[in-house]
Amino acid sequence: MPKSDDCFFSMDNLFFSSPDETENFPVKEKSLDWFLPPAPLISEIPDIQELEEEIESYKLLGKGKMPRMLTSNLKIINEDTNCISPTQKIHFSYNVHEQDYLNLGGSNNNDMSHVAGKLMYGSSQKYKNHMGAKSPSARSSPGDTKLHDVAEDRQGTSAFKKRLSRTCDSEHDCDYADGSLNLSSHISPVKLTQTKISKENAWTCSNSKQKRQYSTNKFKANDAFSASGIGKDIFKAPSFPAASQPHDIQGITPNGLGSLKAVTEIPAKFRNIFKEFPYFNYIQSKAFDDLLYTDRNFVICAPTGSGKTVVFELAITRLLMEVPLPWLNMKIVYMAPIKALCSQRFDDWKEKFGPVGLNCKELTGDTVMDDLFEIQHANIIITTPEKWDSVTRKWRDNSFIQLVRLFLIDEVHVIKDENRGPTLEVVVSRMKTVQSLSRDLESASPVPVRFVAVSATIPNAEDIAEWLSDGERPAVCLKMDESHRPVKLQKVVLGFPCSSSQTEFKFDLALNYKVYSVIRTYSDQKPTLVFCSTRKGVQQAASVLVKDAKFIISVEQKLRLQKSAYSIRDSKLKDTLVYGVGYHHAGMELSDRKLVEGLFTSGDLPVLFTTSTLAMGMNMPAHLVVIKSTMHYSGGVFEEYSETDILQMIGRAGRPQFDTTATAVIMTRLSTREKYVQMLACNDTVESSLHRHLIEHLNAEIVLHTITDVNIALDWIRSTMLYIRALKNPSHYGFSSGLNKDGIEAKLQELCLKNLKDLSSLDLIKMDEDVNFKPTEAGRLMAWYYITFETVKKFCAISGKETLLDLISMISSCNEFLDVQLRISEKRILNTLNKDPNRITIRFPMAERIKTREMKVNCLIQAQLGCIPIQDFALTQDTVKIFRNGSRIARWLSDFVAAQEKKFAVLLNSVILTKCFKCKLWENSKHVSKQLDKIGISLSNTMVNAGLTSFKKIEEANARELELILNRHPPFGTQIKEAVAHLPKYELEVEQIARYSDIKAEILVTIILRNFEQLQTKRTAPDFHYATLIIGDADNQVVFKHKIMDSVLLKSGNWVKKIDVKRALISEDLSINLISSDYVGLDIHQKFTVFYFGPRKFVNETAMERSSETDISHSDYSGRATATGSSKGMATCKKPGNRECHHHCKNKHACGHDCCKIGVAQKPEVKESAMSSYLSDLKSRDAVSSLPLAKRLKIQMNKSQNVDLKEFGFTPRPSLSSISRSEYLNTPELSILEQRNQHEIYGKVQQGPSEYRDKEVLGVNLELGNEVWDDFDDESLIEVMSLSADAEKMAASGFGDTRDSSLGGSKLPFQKSSSRFQRDNSNSFASSPGKPDAYLRDCSRSSFGLSSVAEIPQRAENASLANLQERRPLTLSPVIERMCFAHSKKTPQSPKFKEVDIFIGNSGSKKEIDLSKYYPDDAAEEMKALLGIFNGIF
């Protein structure tokens, strides 16, 4: 008698019944080949309702209602059978002499349930009853004939039934297992053929044929269905040794009765979702009724690889059946713990549910928040807990969240994970809260949210079911143990000795030499997958294995591996691949990874080493999985794998699509062996980790107004898994084990109150005396941007003067980057990026070498912003991850600083840094073209090398030249120019309103969009592009901040705002900045000086610098913001007494110039003797020189042809009367141009001579006779006159308007105009109506060494020269006189001509001497000639 536990069948197997031992098999046998037809299409399978109606017509149902479900031992859903190729045959020894016909009408009524189309596994007793129906009397029963006639009349009604009735004529390839089968059909009289299978021919495909086992031509389960003997013949087969029985274990229950649901129970329009199989497997069939015919919450715990995904698809089908078309107000959320699973599910469901009419959208960390607009129209949202947490923190603003009807949770056992678990727990609790609040707010009862959760095998699944209750009753919980696993998995834990002195690194290296013995013992010459903890460990282990072992591979397989190795970029991988060993990790090139995955899937690669990337969702055909070392490097330290990681890795073994049996081996230390034995036995209870991360989630709920006081906070805690587990296991959460329910609730409430006080300490929430909570703006920003509490705490301590470098350093140390690891192999590249004299390095190098995670993050951020290429692929991946989180932190920081009313410098730098993260460029980068479409880093570098460093230059360039530069065909250049032309072009105007006060002023700021008419038709910038206006004063206080949308400017072309300004203590200067949100190169930075009544600390001047493309470094901006002023300005020349200024303002009462309103005040007189100034100048020039005096004298004497110095002595001549200078000492001081705070540019300007101004006048008489000039070589003064020609060239080359001044407004004693007429003409030129105000340029002093340049009209020059010659005819020698007149004739008649005062050369440095202050016009030239004698001497 066969036993019930012998009934193990392959899912592709024909349904054989065990032979009757009383039967005699004749010796004469004939070999017969049996072929199976291809599987019928799903559309050909009739509905169960149709079959039931047909059975009713036979009147065979009797009293009992026929069950709706079909039972079969066919292959489970979504998993292909493990079988041989379709070309292989199974040979049966067929006895032609023994044929018996069985009429269904003669069967026992107690065993007639099979007639309803139900395929049943029967117990031994039922087997006997059924076999006993084959008596002759039963065959000759009158009922048989009647049933036969009826069946013949209906034979042509169904193509499907005709197909089932045909003799099998196709090849069938499958494995047979032990057991007996009873198969009956109601369609027609079925011939029962007793067949004996010879032992030598029974099996043509053994398990040794592994290549076929992993063939890509996988046999479908519906092929077995059509070939199962329903058509005509039923075979009786003897028992076989169980070779492949584990994958048929489903369908067997302890009672001997199991049933499988048919796909035909699904409505016809949804059957294509399950088109891969005709029947659901045992686990899915057990959950079928609860999922498809009820709306209750559902939790299922089943082994990995048991087809749990179909559980979700059944729940979706139920919702589609209930909700009418067009499904607009219905959303389904699928949540998985990792992005790899989300991506896999998205690709799968997009194909399955797309034809049905559902729109799928993936929402993970790789997607930006802009995708929220797209998920508004998505029906199925596939996301991670972290991403859905950030979305639902604004659920009151996002109405689509209230449209969620079905919430699917994959891998719900992740709730016990320290990092991911709290987020998963809070998200599910929040979705329950959304449902309850919606029920309270709406009068009509809203449609509830259904929760369906899937978990690996865990001991306390009832706790999860209780947590997912609908408020009235817990969720339905279905627990399936390992006995129902489709593929039997053998789990082995191997412990290896590890001494206390041995590091984890050395232990991991030692395991590399033990991997081969594990593979040889457990792989059974089938594909093996080895998980390693690090990327470097993967390469090392593969290299060791290649040296130790040679895997037997066929010649064809070796040729395929060698051919694939040619395409591999990784040289080490190329060496190991030809020996049948490969490796795979996230740091490899994508092409290499795909190629290795393909080789392993096809079976050509026997061994694959990998990191955790393949453990999460990748379905690889591994018979053996080896976890080499249970320690991995995370967060800077070695720690044990979590249970979730272990289960995911061993879940890669024995996938039903590829294998029948599988083995998982864990290699660990002896000390931890027992821990993993218990873990694999699924004895670890799922506990909550929410109590360790409660503070961020409490803040989020307060922002959502879910929690308003302590009592409601406790109510919210009751909706979490933490509360359920704390009641059952209080000691795990730090509570006393003897506490009752009230005591535990009090402890939880105390825990909440502690975290709430921490939030209140940082002003994230407001608490009153009644312990009521209200969120603050800072708390809202923390919740909305998903920022950790520690990060907020770090930035709350900012001083307000932080530079860009400071902010980047603070961001790099945030907890959001804890998952970034610093690998030893990366340090060389990072140090090269940081400091390298031969390469382009980062903008703000770090003093030390790269040693920490924070330094790595800092370096990669700066490298990306500086457009420095990073060659290492792993570092490139890390950079993408860093910028994803860093951009979010920077956006939060700019909003946080603005909300906290922090200082101006840190606000401006945070806004600029936000834009830098978005554009991935520095704010002063020359690679502005990289922001345009079709321009990458390579083309951008080409444009920078060609000098196209701004949008203005690109727009002015010729389109054909652009194409030549970029090596592109037309119309590429035209497209680039059009893109630039349609960028917004801002213009900023500031003026002061004529209402003055000593502490307050009013300014009018106007922002003009110059090309707003052009932007009406086309825009390059996105629709939501805006510019931020930030105004700050010299005290580092924010005066004004506002975001101006482009859409506002497009309406009228401008935006005007009146702003009240309070007087600053340090200076009246304002810094006005317009920062684009999306583009580098559009910013405007401008200075404006406000006028106030009352005493002033600084020289009153208006300084305005306008730049459409910023070129200033904001890293030291806070220093400039608080300085006395850093702008370039120009003060007009002044006459004695009050007078009107010469600004050409249209409305002098409304402009920002204070001199336009009150006039120009008279400068104080400076009484200083000529000799004192002269000696001061000599001292200054002598101090500047870098050469010793003796050496300089020697050089100059050689140049002067050894002139005797005695000839230059000062000889008093009584014949020349002394000229009194006292009458000239009261000459009013002439105002000059001032340049302030430019030490870094004008570092060589000397301030020493100014100390002589107030000294007593020296009564020294210094005169020279005419014979001094007669003896002096006139050629020594040629250099002086050539300098005047240089000034003329300077004016013609575009520097004619350049005016310079001394440092900090201090006036050197000789920095005056050369004559009185020059002074008068200088004033007249400044007041010319045709000349606008000029701005200082940096190049004047650095290029020419000038400190004062006065413009002289030609007519004044001619008159002055004639006057000078008439008054002092004997002052100059004839040579000098001819030179002066020749120079005056060559001067062009241009108002831009500059006449430069005479200079005295001194070892490369020239010093200007202006004597017009101390002498009358006729005596000034005499003194200049005197000083020219000493050219080069001092």
UniProtKB/Swiss-Prot annotation:
Biased composition (Polar residues): 1311-1327
Listed cofactors: Zn(2+)
Top-level division of the source organism's lineage: Eukaryota
Entry's Gene Ontology molecular function annotations: ATP binding; ATP hydrolysis activity; helicase activity; nucleic acid binding
Knocked-out gene: effects: Male and female mutants are sterile due to severe blockage of spermatogenesis and oogenesis.
Annotated family: Belongs to the helicase family. SKI2 subfamily.
Name of protein: Probable ATP-dependent DNA helicase HFM1
Gene: Hfm1
